[in-house]
């Protein structure tokens, strides 16, 4: 304003004074407009700058969050890698450490000294590591020995052959006594010899007698020997170990005897246990002069079986059930008291027994009222339980073939005739064969 007044000459007249006033007013208005424009430009620039700074702030915050997440991930990875490094170092140290010798404890002399037998054969009097509990060191225990001092480093768990573990049925048999027909007397004898000692041992203690150690079931094929053994295991809730006699016959010397020994050891460990040896005649045939190495190996396996049954060591709640259809060829040593204390014959069922078996197998069948089970039992003389089951199945197949909703008397008669023809034909005949 002062500059404007200095640049203007002094007014002489009123007109000049008015012109001067108007000029000054216009100049001031122009300056105010320029100032307002500059102000708006400055505000716009400031707003843009603030917006840019806010965007940058958000970007930096996002980068900080990402950096923190990366930091946490890296720390986690670091911990995992450190753990793997420690594990690898431990494995490396174990690989660099000398191997240990496998041995067996023979005798415990005192709290600090133990007699062991190494895998090479010699026996040594050694000491045990302080980390080994002295109460766990017992004769027969497997252990590891230091190569230099032969001191006991640690105890190993007992080892059983995988084939022996395969003999144990994980699931308890589902068969029960009601699934067995025509063997009422035999069931009672087996229950007295096997089930009663496991469930009520105090009865034998009261009377003062030892319970039977084993039961031998013999009779023609298909009469229910295996079924009876499964029913006993089901009723006693005992571990059931099933082995076929031929499985105990091995190729190499001593393998069969080792399997028998481990079978008894595992049975004692899992007591109460029922060992069922099916087709025991495969390993228990009468001993004769062995002409081949295979015959001698079978005899060695039989002797180990006899030793296990003799009870040199108490077997606890372990019962043995043997089954065979050739009792005439069994070794006499197997049949003496103290091994198989009860020898029970499982004969072919009579007419009453066949009727009982038919009732068991027809419980779930849909039959017409014309079916007379006593009549069918009379027509199946000489048939065993397996034959009667096959007859029931064949009768059902005839009903399905003829699209009938239920089995008729004629279906059973046709099934009886078919089963009879199946047994009369040779195995190579193609006519009259059974469905299954």
Curated annotation (Swiss-Prot):
Q: Entry's NCBIfam families?
A: PRK03992.1, proteasome-activating nucleotidase
* Similarity remark: Belongs to the AAA ATPase family.
* Cited function: ATPase which is responsible for recognizing, binding, unfolding and translocation of substrate proteins into the archaeal 20S proteasome core particle. Is essential for opening the gate of the 20S proteasome via an interaction with its C-terminus, thereby allowing substrate entry and access to the site of proteolysis. Thus, the C-termini of the proteasomal ATPase function like a 'key in a lock' to induce gate opening and therefore regulate proteolysis.
Specify the superkingdom.
Archaea
Source organism per UniProt = Methanoregula boonei (strain DSM 21154 / JCM 14090 / 6A8)
Name listed for the protein in its UniProt record = Proteasome-activating nucleotidase
The domain-related comment in the record is: Consists of three main regions, an N-terminal coiled-coil domain that may assist in substrate recognition, an interdomain involved in PAN hexamerization, and a C-terminal ATPase domain of the AAA type.
Region called Docks into pockets in the proteasome alpha-ring to cause gate opening, residue ranges: 434-436
> Which residues are involved in binding ATP?
222-227, 361
GO MF, any single term: ATP binding
Please state the gene responsible for encoding this protein: pan
Keywords, alphabetical: ATP-binding, Chaperone, Coiled coil, Cytoplasm, Nucleotide-binding, Proteasome
Query: Per the record, what is one GO cellular component?
Result: proteasome-activating nucleotidase complex
């Amino acid at each position: 304003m002062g500059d404007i007044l200095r640049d203007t000459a002094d007014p002489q007249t009123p007109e000049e004074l008015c012109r001067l006033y108007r000029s000054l007013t216009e100049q001031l208005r122009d300056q105010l407009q320029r100032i307002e424009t500059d102000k708006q430009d400055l505000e716009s620039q400031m707003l843009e700058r603030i917006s840019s700074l806010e965007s940058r702030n958000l970007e930096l915050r996002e980068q900080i969050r990402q950096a923190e997440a990366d930091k946490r991930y890296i720390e986690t990875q670091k911990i995992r890698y450190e753990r793997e490094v420690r594990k690898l170092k431990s494995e490396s140290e174990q690989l660099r450490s000398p191997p240990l010798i496998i041995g067996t404890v023979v005798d415990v002399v005192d709290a600090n000294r133990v007699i062991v037998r190494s895998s090479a054969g010699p026996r040594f009097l050694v000491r045990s590591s302080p980390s080994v509990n002295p109460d766990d060191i017992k004769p027969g225990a497997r252990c590891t020995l230091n190569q230099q001092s032969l001191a006991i480093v640690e105890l190993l768990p007992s080892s059983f052959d995988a084939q022996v573990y395969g003999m144990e049925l994980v699931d308890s048999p589902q068969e029960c006594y009601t699934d067995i027909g025509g063997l009422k007397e035999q069931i009672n004898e087996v229950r007295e010899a096997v089930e009663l000692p496991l469930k009520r041992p105090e009865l034998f203690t009261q009377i003062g007698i030892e319970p039977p150690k084993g039961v031998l079931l013999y009779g023609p094929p298909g009469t229910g020997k295996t079924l009876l053994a499964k029913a006993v295991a089901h009723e006693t809730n005992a571990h059931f170990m099933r082995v076929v006699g031929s499985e105990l016959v091995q190729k190499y010397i001593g393998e069969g005897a080792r399997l028998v020994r481990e079978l008894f050891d595992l049975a004692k460990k899992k007591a109460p246990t029922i060992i069922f040896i099916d087709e025991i005649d495969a390993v228990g045939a009468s001993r004769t002069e062995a002409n081949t190495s295979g015959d001698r190996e079978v005899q060695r396996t039989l002797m180990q079986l006899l030793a296990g049954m003799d009870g040199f060591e108490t077997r606890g709640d372990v019962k043995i059930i043997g089954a065979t259809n050739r009792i005439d060829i069994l070794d006499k040593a197997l049949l003496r008291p103290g091994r198989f204390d009860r020898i029970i014959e499982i004969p072919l069922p009579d007419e009453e027994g066949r009727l009982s078996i038919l009732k068991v197998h027809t419980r779930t069948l849909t039959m017409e009222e014309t079916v007379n089970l006593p009549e069918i039992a009379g027509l199946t003389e000489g048939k065993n339980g397996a034959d009667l089951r096959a007859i029931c199945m064949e009768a059902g197949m005839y009903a399905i073939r003829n699209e009938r909703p239920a089995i008729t008397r004629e279906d059973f008669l046709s099934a009886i005739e078919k089963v009879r023809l199946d047994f009369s034909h040779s195995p190579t005949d193609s006519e009259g064969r059974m469905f299954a």
